[in-house]
Structures are given as C-alpha cells and as structure tokens.
Amino acid sequence: MQFLALALTILLAAATQAVPMQADAPSQLEHVKVAMMEYMAQVKETAQRSIDHLDDTEYKEYKVQLSQSLDNLQQYAQTASESLAPYSEAIGVQLTEATAAVRAEVMKDVEELRSQLEPKRAELKEVLDKHIDEYRKRLEPLIKDIVEQRRTELEAFRVKIEPVVEEMRAKVSANVEETKAKLMPIVETVRAKLTERLEELRTLASPYAEEYKEQMVKAVGEVREKVVPLTTDFKGQLGPAAEQAKEKLMALYETISQAMKA
C-alpha cells in the first residue's frame, strides 16, 4: 500500500510538470533517499544526546547497547538504500516513460488554456484599471482631508512657535550685546598693556638704533672719503666710465645717508 501511494504521488507530480521534467523522476527518488538518510542521522544524533545525559555509573552498559543499536539501524538504512538504488532508477525510468503521454496531454491543455486566456488580458487590464480608479476616487478625498489637516496643524504650530522664535532672537541679540559689553573692558585692558609693552620696547631699543645709525653714517663717510680720491685718479684714466661709476657711488651714498636719517 505504501509503495502504491508513493507511485501515485510520483505519477501526479510528473503529470503536472513540463517536458523538461522527463529526466527528474530519478532525481526525485534520489532526493527521497537522501532525505531519509538525513532523517536517520538526525534521529541518531538526538537519541545520542539523550543518552549522553544518563549517568555513566548506572546506565553505562545500557548506553553502550543503545548506541550500538543506533549505529546498526543507521548502517541498515544505508545498506538498504544502496541495495534499492538500481530499482529506484529503474522505477524512475519506467514512470517517466509511462507518464509521457499524460504529460503531453497536460502540456496540450496548458497551451490551449494559455491561448484562450491571451485575448482576455486586455479585458483583465481594463477591469483592473477600473477597480484601481474606483479605489483612487474613494481614497482621494480621505487623502486630501489628511493633507489639509496636517497643513492646518503645521500652520497652528508655526503660529505658536513664531513668538518663541522672535523672543529667542531678541534674547540672542541682547546676549551678544551683553557679552560685548563684558568683553570690551578686557579687550581695552589687553590693548593698553600691549601698547605699553611696545612703547617700552621701542624706548629700550632707541639708543641701540641711534648708535647703529651713527656707526653706519660714519662707515659710509669713511667709504666716501676713500672712494672720492680713487674716482679722481681713475677719472683721467677711464674717462666717461669713471665719471659714471662715480655718479653711481655718490647716488648709493646719498640713498644710504637718507635711510640712516629717517
């Protein structure tokens, strides 16, 4: 009886599949075999976990016997599966051949149904569009009411918060002025201190600057005293070139002198 039920199940499954399913019957049987082996492994694992919780002292011999029984059961299932493998493949091939005509009829009926439904697609689209338009007309007033309600709520919120914003803006301006008033004395104090320190620095550096200026003027004068005789000597020898060199040196001297007097 169980074999007959399995055969009918496979027959019905094959009858509802397309042509490419002709080679799937053996694989379906293979899936059943794999599923049974996985189920046996899970049963063994669950039972083994339960056995492991038993006390080794009192149930040691029982645990060994039960573990051995589970191993034997799994091995028996594996052996039976391997022994039935050729028969499973043969049954799959026979079922595929036996149901070929049925599958062909099913595919023919499906194709006829598709041909009949194809012209109905436009009608179906029209009906769906009609229903969607009805839903839209029904929902549109509700959506407008919700939007208007939210707009009213936002306007009321704006009216409530606007005075608060203005008050905060006024407070910020007042706080800025207050902070500025508090900071200005500090800024003026720092500015006065810096001015005082700069004046002290200028006063301290003034003697050194005057001394440096005097030394530079003296050095330039010495250079001039040495250069003038040389230019006079070279004047007769070099002619116009010496005169130009003298003019350039005198101009340089005047520039340095003016800079020192500044």
Swiss-Prot record:
Residues 32-63 are annotated as: 3 X approximate tandem repeats. It holds the Pfam family Apolipoprotein. Sequence repeats lie at residues 64-85, 87-107, 108-118, 119-140, 141-162, 163-184, 185-206, 207-228, 229-239, 240-262. One of its GO terms (biological process) is acylglycerol homeostasis. Keywords: Cholesterol metabolism, HDL, Lipid metabolism, Lipid transport, Repeat, Secreted, Signal, Steroid metabolism, Sterol metabolism, Transport. InterPro entries: ApoA_E, Apolipoprotein_A1/A4/E. Residues 1-18 form the signal peptide. The keyword tRNA processing does not apply. One of its GO terms (cellular component) is extracellular vesicle. GO terms for molecular function: cholesterol transfer activity; phosphatidylcholine-sterol O-acyltransferase activator activity; phospholipid binding. It is found in: Secreted. Its main location: secreted. Residues 64-262 are annotated as: 10 X approximate tandem repeats. PANTHER family: APOLIPOPROTEIN, APOLIPOPROTEIN A-I. Belongs to the apolipoprotein A1/A4/E family. Participates in the reverse transport of cholesterol from tissues to the liver for excretion by promoting cholesterol efflux from tissues and by acting as a cofactor for the lecithin cholesterol acyltransferase (LCAT). This is Apolipoprotein A-I-2. It comes from Oncorhynchus mykiss.
